[in-house]
Amino acid sequence: MEAYEQVQKGPLKLKGVAELGVTKRKKKKKDKDKAKMLEAMGTSKKNEEEKRRCLDKRTPAQAAFEKMQEKRQMERILKKASKTHKQRVEDFNRHLDTLTEHYDIPKVSWTK
């Protein structure tokens, strides 16, 4: 038990470091931050509008092409949304009925 009598009890201390107390951090005032944020949001909206005007360097043909692409995509979406799933399944079954039976597997007979 004599070996355990030499154990240091208490907090560890670092050599060469003066004892410094725990310092509390200063709290930031939120009112000033909120005011700055509101100002920044107002200016950022204005900047975004200006950037949009400056960044639109597409040719008229490119703008027309993208406009037509969006229009066609909307038409496709409306066309798909107009039918219910049940109607689509019925149309698909009608289409399969009209196909030739070329791809059907012929009957396999063991006798012939």
From Swiss-Prot:
GO terms for cellular component: nucleolus. The keyword Cell cycle applies. Pfam families: FAM32A (PF08555). Residues 23-56 are annotated as: Disordered. It comes from the Eukaryota. Signal peptide: none annotated. One of its GO terms (biological process) is apoptotic process. Keywords: Apoptosis, Cell cycle, Nucleus. Its main location: nucleus. The keyword Cell cycle applies. May induce G2 arrest and apoptosis. May also increase cell sensitivity to apoptotic stimuli. This is Protein FAM32A. It comes from Rattus norvegicus. The gene is Fam32a.
